[in-house]
Amino acid sequence: MEVRKLSISWQFLIVLVLILQILSALDFDPYRVLGVSRTASQADIKKAYKKLAREWHPDKNKDPGAEDKFIQISKAYEILSNEEKRSNYDQYGDAGENQGYQKQQQQREYRFRHFHENFYFDESFFHFPFNSERRDSIDEKYLLHFSHYVNEVVPDSFKKPYLIKITSDWCFSCIHIEPVWKEVIQELEELGVGIGVVHAGYERRLAHHLGAHSTPSILGIINGKISFFHNAVVRENLRQFVESLLPGNLVEKVTNKNYVRFLSGWQQENKPHVLLFDQTPIVPLLYKLTAFAYKDYLSFGYVYVGLRGTEEMTRRYNINIYAPTLLVFKEHINRPADVIQARGMKKQIIDDFITRNKYLLAARLTSQKLFHELCPVKRSHRQRKYCVVLLTAETTKLSKPFEAFLSFALANTQDTVRFVHVYSNRQQEFADTLLPDSEAFQGKSAVSILERRNTAGRVVYKTLEDPWIGSESDKFILLGYLDQLRKDPALLSSEAVLPDLTDELAPVFLLRWFYSASDYISDCWDSIFHNNWREMMPLLSLIFSALFILFGTVIVQAFSDSNDERESSPPEKEEAQEKTGKTEPSFTKENSSKIPKKGFVEVTELTDVTYTSNLVRLRPGHMNVVLILSNSTKTSLLQKFALEVYTFTGSSCLHFSFLSLDKHREWLEYLLEFAQDAAPIPNQYDKHFMERDYTGYVLALNGHKKYFCLFKPQKTVEEEEAIGSCSDVDSSLYLGESRGKPSCGLGSRPIKGKLSKLSLWMERLLEGSLQRFYIPSWPELD
């Protein structure tokens, strides 16, 4: 009996809890949650949401109910910021997206949904660390924000690569990879790899900027470029991914064959050279990361002591092959400038070693940036920095003045004095500023002691009076000046403003352009196939659409040309059709009714230059309408010709030209011989032969099929009835031809009247009803 009572009590308690949950769900009012009225604008709603979100964010507010409150605030803003959801809620009390149901059904869905959303399980009971507040605090240490990423991570990625994880709440895969991620980042961070974590829920802008559209995502950043990790999340794959981010030419493999060349490169590269001797055949990742961090200051090489061909180096430099040994060489390749040897080299030890040896003993000033680093501006009297500058000529081998200057620098190394040298022929303005009398030092070396006063180039300096030849007396004088300078800084009595140094090691313009182009192509390739596929879709759609239109136009045009050639019949077939009274038109009347594309008629002169393109190789289906004129009738005939043919310029198959009768009479008369009947041909020795007037003639030339149609000016009413017809040769052969007689010449009427019927002839040309005169081949136009 007692057990039954206890069961009833538990049932009653469960029902009571469910009722309370349902009532709380029904009582959910987004306006009340955000503290705004039902008539509030979107600006007021957004302002209230931002204020409450900052106040109740679980990462900032440690109140136990902050998480539930923040969820309610987010849900309320989601409803009220969407006009459709807001209207649905105002009418039916429903915050859902389905609006096609009736009011009662919507209310039932509303009750069930809000009951589900307000019934939470205790995550700690199931040990599911979904919430970022209860998740391992290791991610909080590396959380990135957009401003931090842009201002710090991107610039720092030029010195070290970054490995970034994109995560979010309620991400099962994120939980699955977390143990591996924790192990790998602890290992890589000790090697010098930057680590970052982006929460996609709170930093959507940064996640979108990185191109991460799903969680979890892992990406690497180096030199400002983003690369995504696409393999299984295991330790070896992540290490290989970080190693693949680094350039492949950071570390050079050195053996007995090339170590002299490698170490001798200090003069050309103006850098110290570092050699690591180790027993592993693969270059350690720590050494590669160090080489990337200091690539602008030193050159790095690696010697695998287990390989044959390294015995000479190990013996010469007394290397212990059982422990990693790091050597740095400067101007002397016979002995290292510094050495460290340890079985477990840490990053901090290597960084300290490299920092001490970043520059040569007497480095060459090759850029303004290097000048600022070697000769910094003084900040106080206790932080004075002096630069002893050797101005010398460039030589392929070490000159005696430079060797003496180098030995002096080695013997007098101080914290407040830096020794540098400048090639006076490469930095002419810089050298002339420091030399009081450049002619006296022509072809000789000189030494100046200077101190920079500001970043604008103002310096105080003292130049040795005599040229520097490297003798013992020169060294004694320079040493005396340096000793005196410690006691009296006023020794530097001269003052000047130095010009900026030119960058001697900068690549030429073509190389810079090539590198920029290759980087741009690489970025586009990565963006298309890896990083931002969704963002690239509009651009890809535009490119493929343009290519489709382009190739589609070419293909259609090609098929159109082939159809024209296929439909064209041979001259013999056309002659047979003409004999039976049937002609095959090459143009349609629709062409004549096209609206002109331009407000003018484009008429070109037919010369020996344009003859081939405008006639001989004219495309199939195209014709060239040529007006015959002389120099005296050119202006008037062209004006009338343009008026007559203007309505036909809408056809793309017609081209218009004019031919000078004074230049090409023989060519014209050769063509007209094919337009004559059996009547006697005038003899060329006839006295009227050269006086024949062809001005006003119009020829329609089909270059592909080798035929033409002829228009002749008409004189009488009877003759005008046959205008443009080439079929009645007997009645039109000699019409319009002047024999030089006033009674039958054309001088009695205006010149423009010759083309008064040309438009009618053009219509018949487009109909295909004109007679065609075929020729075997087009004559040359001399």
From Swiss-Prot:
Gene3D superfamilies: DnaJ domain, Glutaredoxin. Changing H57Q: Does not lead to enlargement of autophagosomes when overexpressed. Glycans are attached at N631. Residues 26-535 are cytoplasmic. SUPFAM superfamilies: Chaperone J-domain, Thioredoxin-like. The chain crosses the membrane at residues 536-556. InterPro entries: DnaJ_C16_autophagy_reg, DnaJ_domain, DnaJ_domain_CS, DNAJC16_TRX, J_dom_sf, Thioredoxin-like_sf, Thioredoxin_domain. Pfam families: DnaJ, Thioredoxin. The gene is DNAJC16. The lineage of its organism: Eukaryota, Metazoa, Chordata, Craniata, Vertebrata. One of its GO terms (biological process) is regulation of autophagosome size. Its main location: endoplasmic reticulum. It comes from Homo sapiens (Human). Residues 557-782 are extracellular. This is DnaJ homolog subfamily C member 16.
